[in-house]
Amino acid sequence: MRALTKRRIVSIAEFSIHPIGTGTSVGPYVKRALQAISKIEGLEYQVTPMATILEAQDVSTILKAVEASHEAVRSMGAKRISSTLRIDERLDKLRTMNDKTESVSE
């Protein structure tokens, strides 16, 4: 993961992508989606077993990552894609995904 710099706003999102009609294994599709989002400037991400956590200075960067993921999965021949996106845009103070995790493990 790339190091974060201080900034005014941080948007954190939980994103998962699911190709439909491609069989039971989605690993290759998720891998291709991750390759696509790794190229998005200003985006940090953390892979978890059920979703990927995205972090950026603005929501538009997160949406670019979602779009890039869909394009990557389409390029592999998926005819239908379902995705889930949940965004937390905190405006009152700087909180990163690591801060949020640390605050509940103290």
State each model region's role.
Residues 2-106:
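Charge-rich, low-complexity N-terminal segments
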